[in-house]
Amino acid sequence: MAVPKKKTSKGKRNQRHSIWKAKAGIAAQKALSLGKSVLTGRSQGFVYPIDEQEEAEE
């Protein structure tokens, strides 16, 4: 079984943790932006399935 030779320093651990948190923040920001784009109805990059019942009512 692979075992690390030395203990990782707190600085290195914090650096890795901050990178992980930054990536998560960027992903959350992109998801929020995408959600806002979909809700406005002006997004051109999506194809929405249209229910036949909705077309009949209109």
UniProtKB/Swiss-Prot annotation:
GO process terms (BP): translation
UniProt keywords, alphabetically: Ribonucleoprotein, Ribosomal protein
SUPFAM superfamilies membership: Zn-binding ribosomal proteins
GO cellular component: large ribosomal subunit
GO molecular function: structural constituent of ribosome
Top-level taxon of the source organism: Bacteria
Family, as annotated: Belongs to the bacterial ribosomal protein bL32 family.
Protein known as: Large ribosomal subunit protein bL32
Native source organism of the sequence: Prochlorococcus marinus (strain MIT 9211)
